[in-house]
Every structure is written in structure tokens, then in C-alpha cells.
Amino acid sequence: MRQTKTGILLANLGTPDAPTPEAVKRYLKQFLSDRRVVDTPRLLWWPLLRGVILPLRSPRVAKLYQSIWMDGGSPLMVYSREQQQALAARLPDTPVALGMSYGLPSLESAVDELLASDVDHIVVLPLYPQYSCSTVGAVWDELGRILARKRRIPGISFIRDYADDGAYIDALAKSARESFAMHGEPDVLLLSYHGIPQRYADEGDDYPQRCRDTTRELVSALGLPPEKVMMTFQSRFGREPWLTPYTDETLKMLGEKGTGHIQVMCPGFAADCLETLEEIAEQNREIFLEAGGKKYAYIPALNATPEHIDMMLKLTAPYR
């Protein structure tokens, strides 16, 4: 009997392939066309997206990408490739592919790469620690569309999320302790998660609870008093209410109250990207300092640290 050959698919959101208005427009069009991301009726959404949002946002967002672009490409792509390569180095007999929900490399190209390696079984690890319909759900949907076009369908193991996994919490705690050792222990550790519309949560998305689960476990691992840790939500888009409290408004409030030293961690981001390196490390830093705060440090994402790769090994081990 032939032994089953397993491959691993690391999935993330995606990124423009260049910091130009044209590339950003292509990326945003694909991203904002996904009903999992924006579920506004199409007759209302298409004219707004194509006639207003893409023409206005693409040049502005391209400038933001230019401020963080790395020699090897966008930070998300650079760190995601490093994660893929580091995991593959630890698993020499297991093919590891990288696929993005939007942009390149696509999820379909990742599936094709693994099937070309003659795998019988694919372990799908969406690198979103906290489940949301708009992220993990989008990977699930696209995977279904891809496999619906295949004659040969492999076995699939799909890891829904890992918000309170011990190896994940340990990796976050180690990263926070290293930052405390470098900058001193902050007056407040602010945990900023990507927001979603409040309506999604009201309709059953358990993302807010999964964020609370991560926060609870991390606070316990660090041994910090609860009053020294705050949980907020960032990157809201559009006019409808999103999860609160908002990160930028909270930092402004803390600065105005005279909070001296803030450190910000974004536990929901597996790799640094525009939302962490520009929005949190730069924009929100300015908000806090201009409001009267004294010291601000951003704690980097786990990226390709050994502890993060250890976590990926642990999560995928039962299915390999």
C-alpha cells in the first residue's frame, strides 16, 4: 500500500506586486470584490468601487506602500516567503507551498504546485490566528472553487484558527518579553487586532471572542495585571460601525491622559505588512505622541522567528 504523501499550504491575504497606483488598483479591485470582505449588494457596490474608491485610494495607498517597500518586495511577501522556506527546511520530505487569497502567488497556483509534487493530502494553514469569515472564510471559499475544477481532489485538512494554541501564545509572550527587555516594561501593552464590521459579529462571526481568547491567554502568560493591557481594533473601512474600541482613538485618549509609555502588539498579523509597519508603527505612533504620550514602541509580528515556525510544525503535525 502506497504511503500517503502530504503537502502544506500556507495561506495569507496577499499584497500588490509593486508599490504603484496601477498595481495597488489591481490588488484592491480583487480584494474589495470578494463578498466575504464587502457584502454590499453588487448594484450599489460596483459603481462605488470602480468610480470612487479605486481611483481615489489607489494612488494614496501606493504612496504608503512605497514608504515600507523592501528590496525583496512588499514586507508581507518577503516575510511570507521566509516562513515558507523556514518551514520547508524543517520538513525536507514535505512540500510547502505559499498561496494568497488576492494577488500572487494565488491559492490556485499553490494547490497546483502541491499536486505537481504528487501529494495525496494537503494541510491548509491560513495564517490568521483568529477566525473571521472575511479572512479564513475567504480561503475556504476559494479552495472550494479551485477544487471544483479539478478531476483529482486530494484529501484536505483545514486548520480553522489557533487563537489560544499554546505554542502561538508562547511565541507572542517571548516577543513581548524581548521588547520589554529592550524598551522597559510599558505602562500599557496595547493589543491591536484588525477590525471587522460589528454587523458580521452580530450575525455570528466569532472573531471578537477569538481575539479575547488570545488576549486572555497572553495576559496570563506574561503575568501582567489586567489593567496594564488593552485590546483594540484597527484598520476600519467605510461608514458602518466596526468592532470597538478603535486603536487610533484609544491611543489619542491615552496620550491625552498622560500615559507615558505604550507598547503595541498586533497578535492577529502573522507577518508584518502595511497595517502594522505603516498604520501602527508610524501613523498611530504620531497620534499617541502628538496627544501627549512620551514613549511608543511597536512590537514586530512573529514573521519567520524560530518560535513561529515551531508553532507551524506543531499545528500541522497531527495531519502529516
Swiss-Prot record:
Fe cation binds at H194, E275. Pfam families: Ferrochelatase. The keyword Metal-binding applies. Belongs to the ferrochelatase family. Pathway: Porphyrin-containing compound metabolism; protoheme biosynthesis; protoheme from protoporphyrin-IX: step 1/1. This is Ferrochelatase. It comes from the Bacteria. It catalyses: heme b + 2 H(+) = protoporphyrin IX + Fe(2+). Its EC number is 4.98.1.1. It is an enzyme of class 4 (lyase). It comes from Salmonella newport (strain SL254). Monomer. The keyword Lipoprotein does not apply. InterPro entries: Ferrochelatase, Ferrochelatase_AS, Ferrochelatase_C, Ferrochelatase_N. Signal peptide: none annotated. Keywords: Cytoplasm, Heme biosynthesis, Iron, Lyase, Metal-binding, Porphyrin biosynthesis.
